[in-house]
Curated annotation (Swiss-Prot):
Xref: InterPro entries: Cfap97/Hemingway, Hmw/CFAP97
Biased composition (Low complexity): 176-201
Protein's UniProt keywords contain Disulfide bond: no
Biased composition (Acidic residues): 152-161
Ranges annotated as biased composition (Polar residues): 219-232, 240-250, 267-277, 503-513
Annotated stretches, region: Disordered: 28-47, 93-296, 313-337, 406-430, 495-514
Tissue: Highly expressed in testis with lower levels detected in other tissues including lung, heart and kidney.
Residues modified as Phosphoserine: S8, S19, S160, S161, S230, S258
Species of origin: Mus musculus (Mouse)
Protein's recorded name: Cilia- and flagella-associated protein 97
Keyword Phosphoprotein: yes
Coiled coil: 382-459
PTM-bearing positions, type Phosphothreonine: T155
One Pfam family recorded for the sequence: Hmw_CFAP97
Length: 541
């Protein structure tokens, strides 16, 4: 009571209540902050778990796609190996058949040479086919390695995208460990299933091809010696060998599986029904065997080309599946795929060129003996049965010699005297009528020849030209009437003066007309003509 003695009765001590209120406020604020912190932690944990779940879901999808691609690539590789082994075995069987057939045809050297050429071309084709298979193997993508000691597992493509989220990993390490364990278990189970499928396919392949491995190794050596491996291909082969799990070595007891499990991808050979076979009817048996060999070689070429086409189709389908996951694959895989496609196209073109060349050679070989067969001379039937062939040849030679001598004598200038004529001998006796007719004919010929000589010797008379006759006429007319008409006559004379070269008959007629006119004028008028100059001669004198 002493403490509160100084306090008045009506007053209340508020300090006590204030302290209690402050304590309650502090408790409430602390509880609120604790709740907020718990909510923040829960939200962060939920976000972290969601991110981890999403990341591991993406990783699981990516791993599943890669595992599927790898299994498909391994299956393709095994299928290609089976086709290689099948082709090599088939080639060996055909070689054995050819060797057995060649023993029957050893007497024909040309056929032996053609068979050696065919076997060498077959070996080249088989090497080229194995080379194309080796080059065309698809390269599987690299499987990411899982390290047991690391809790945080991320691929190379995800590290670049998750650099800004490292603080989330540190917070969510404990809840994500369980999820990672589950994912690792799933991955191990999927890898075991893929490895079991691989081991089953390997076992079936090895069970069916145990006897052919030696041949495939020899063909592989041939291909490796022909095609030098680049450092990129070596790295890829190392990755392939490291990517295969060790579980394939465990199941070796299943090698007794039948060969029917391996799919047979070899195409059916179409029957060669060509019009060239109709030419084989009239050929000897040796040529028939040779043509059969050539047809077998052409079939082998077609089968190899079709097998390569089927392999290219399988690889294209695998590439289409791989294209869906190209966002995760690096650019180097795209470049490798382009290189593989180019190499496949080149191999296909080479095989087609070889096929065309072989077809051309086969056609030439078929046409060659036929030409020789038709070039043989046919037997000419005898036309002259009275003489033997030797006598006929001698007669022909003698005739040719005589003909040459006669032609040589005919070409000489004095050949008429040398060649005997029948007209030189005594003529046959004729009847009297024929003799009289011959004498009359000879007399007529003599008279004609004398007349011809006389006509040739006659010279033309002077003053018989037309111009001279006209001048003479006008001169005479001027003597008779010296009137103005004379001028007109002179003008006409000047007009006619250039016309010369008339015939003798026309000049003669003009001369006669002038003569008659002159005589008429002389008798009628009685004029006396003056004497002419001595150098002028008239036509009628």
């Amino acid at each position: 009571m002493d403490r509160f003695g100084d306090i008045s009765e009506g007053e209340v001590d508020h300090s006590f209540f204030d302290s209690d209120f402050e304590d309650a406020k502090k408790c409430e604020s602390n509880s609120i902050f604790d709740k907020q912190n718990d909510d923040d932690l829960k939200e962060g944990i939920n976000k972290d778990t969601k991110n981890v779940n999403l990341k591991f879901g993406v990783q699981n999808d990516h791993l599943k796609e890669k595992i599927d691609n790898n299994t498909e690539n391994v299956n393709l590789k095994l299928g290609l190996q089976t086709t290689e082994n099948y082709l090599t075995q088939k080639g060996n069987e055909r070689k054995a058949n050819f060797s057995s057939k060649e023993q029957h045809i050893e007497n024909d050297p040309t056929q032996a040479r053609s068979s050696s050429v065919l076997t060498s071309s077959r070996s080249k084709k088989s090497c080229d086919a194995t080379k194309g298979h080796k080059l065309n193997l698809p390269v599987p993508d690299r499987i990411p390695k899982i390290v047991k000691g690391e809790d945080d597992y991320y691929t190379d493509g995800e590290e670049s995208s998750d650099d800004g989220k490292k603080y989330v990993r540190s917070k969510s390490a404990k809840p994500s460990s369980n999820l990672k364990k589950n994912v690792s278990k799933k991955y191990s189970s999927s890898s075991l299933s893929s490895s079991s499928s691989r081991s089953n396919s390997d076992c079936s392949d090895m069970g069916s091809d145990r006897q052919r491995r030696s041949e495939s190794h020899s063909s592989g050596k041939c291909v490796s010696s022909v095609t030098p491996s680049s450092p990129k291909q070596r790295c890829k082969s190392g990755r392939k060998s490291s990517a295969q799990p060790s579980s394939t070595k465990q199941k070796t007891g299943d090698y007794h599986e039948s060969e029917g499990n391996v799919p047979d991808i070899t195409p059916l050979s179409t029957p060669d029904v060509s019009p060239a076979q109709s030419l084989e009817l009239g050929q000897p048996p040796d040529q028939k065997v040779k043509v059969k060999k050539q047809e077998n070689v052409s079939r082998d070429v077609y089968e190899d080309a079709e097998a390569l086409k089927n392999d290219s189709r399988c690889v294209k389908s695998a590439k289409r599946k791989e294209k869906h996951g190209q966002s995760f694959a690096p650019k180097s895989s795209v470049l490798d795929a382009n290189l593989d496609r180019r190499s496949k196209q080149k191999v296909l073109h080479d095989t087609m060129d070889l096929n065309h060349l072989l077809k051309a050679f086969l056609q030439l070989d078929k046409k060659g003996p036929q030409k020789h067969h038709f070039e043989q001379p046919a037997i000419i039937p005898r036309k002259n049965y009275s003489f033997t062939r030797e006598e006929v040849r001698q007669i022909d030679r003698e005739n040719q010699r005589l003909l040459k001598e006669l032609s040589r004598q005919a070409e000489k200038p004095g050949s008429k005297s040398t060649i005997p004529g029948r007209s030189i001998g005594h003529p046959p006796k004729l009847y009297h009528s024929a003799l009289n007719r011959q004498r009359e004919q000879q007399r007529i010929e003599r008279e004609n020849m004398a007349l011809l000589k006389r006509l040739e010797a006659v010279k033309p008379t002077v003053g018989m030209k037309r111009s001279e006759q006209l001048m003479d006429y006008h001169r005479n007319m001027s003597y008779l009437n010296p009137s103005p008409s004379v001028r007109r006559v002179r003008s006409t004379l000047g007009h006619y003066s250039p016309l010369r070269g008339a015939s003798r008959t026309s000049s003669a007629t003009s001369g006669l007309s002038c003569k008659t006119d002159r005589s008429v004028l002389d008798t009628s008028n009685g004029f006396l003509l003056r004497p002419k100059p001595p150098n002028v001669r008239t036509a009628w004198l």
